[in-house]
């Protein structure tokens, strides 16, 4: 059998004439004590809370719920597991302060960075600061596009080194900067990653 899931409102409504086996409804996002949360209901009444923000994480949770149902895992066990579950490096909340949120995410291309920053904008942050770099010996086109995305969607961007491999880190930053320069976004270059993170605080 094939079972399906849907995030109501993700594409307006479910496909005409079709009804998903499980639908996330009344989806809300919140911030509490330096963490971001996703909150939703299924079957009109079952309530779920995730420590991972964003529609894409709600979709992932629905897939997990369906698999758990297939194996007849108790709903309370599923709820508890989803509420506690995090994925290292994927919208990972790092608790530092109650006054701001610090997330680590493996956004390695323009699309993933755009989705991430768009999701974070949905939380209506007072200020959105992004620290990122691009890996060496990989597509150079990606670098400028990521710089442009950060410049458009973040309030402030800190460009830094990220595994330069055999390339000069400063030349990689030049490529990223070529994209961000065409936006109105404020930014700074700090090649040393540890210093870049320290600067953000």
Residues of each region from the PLM?
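Nucleotide phosphate-binding/pyrophosphate-handling subdomain across enzymes
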Residues: 32, 44-156, 178
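Short, active-site-adjacent cap segments at secondary-structure transitions
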Residues: 1, 137-138, 166, 196
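C-terminal helical cap/extension that packs against the catalytic core
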Residues: 13-16, 147-200
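Extended acidic/charged loop-beta regions that coordinate divalent cations
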Residues: 1-47, 85-94
